[in-house]
Amino acid sequence: MVPAMAAAHDNATRTAPVIEDPAVWDDNAEQVLSALEKQFASYGMTLTAKEGYPYLLAVNNAGGTVTVYTVDAATGRYAVPFMAMVCSGGADTPTGYFSTPVDYSWRLLMGPSYGQYATRIYSSYLFHSVPYYSQHKDDVEYDEFNKLGTIASLGCIRLAVVDVKWIYDNCPLGTPVVIYNDKENPGPMGKPGTIYTDPADTEKRGWDPTDPDPANPWDDSFESGTAIRSQAAWDQWEDEREGWMKSLTPTDLQGWSTDSKIEGTRG
């Protein structure tokens, strides 16, 4: 088992991952992406890579999975499965083809609640962490964390901190995003598992287990989360750890948000 797949299995303490054979990832991706390009042609969707934008984010709302595709150097098209991350969307999550316009280290959400490493997709819909009761990293809504992988949000796309921070750090504003629904097929790499946080564990329950903050009481092994990574993604994870730690939001307070009003933001 390659390291990425081993991590996906070992960290999945709530639901087990369903991982497709890496030998068929590319063929699976061709089928999925071809269908999406046709389905969302009226939105202007194209698989031709945008210069300066190495990734396409494909959100399968019904399947609870975000699959990241990178560029096939031979064709210049988004085609290569890079990583799959478990997510929670909502009944009101829109489908379509979009590009990201703005991001926030912390973002005030409906409730009110707060999300880390938020990136706007379209209108009031964002990628963000599982919501927090307050703008403190030890105050996550732990019951909501245990819903990852299911329909649970008010329309935004929730992810574990490790995954949403990857988007925040690696996907420049303007990154293409397609949102669709396919309950039967989560994506070409499969569907990642999920981590269980015990509501009775008062020491750990307030933390997202994957938050790389040194104050996190969870074991460091959970930092890689449950994402299904290609070897290229796993190599990136190892190579970029130093920079990854440098971009942490403050443990206890206020990250910067340039647009922090509740109106127009889901959860």
PLM features: residue spans?
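Sec-dependent signal peptide cleavage junction
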Residues: 1-15
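Low-complexity, intrinsically disordered/propeptide-like segments
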Residues: 4, 8, 39, 248-251, ...
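Intrinsic-disorder/low-complexity regions
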Residues: 9-10, 20, 59
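A general sequence property marking short-to-moderate contiguous segments
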Residues: 18-44
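Intrinsic-disorder/low-complexity loop/linker signature
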Residues: 30, 75-76, 190
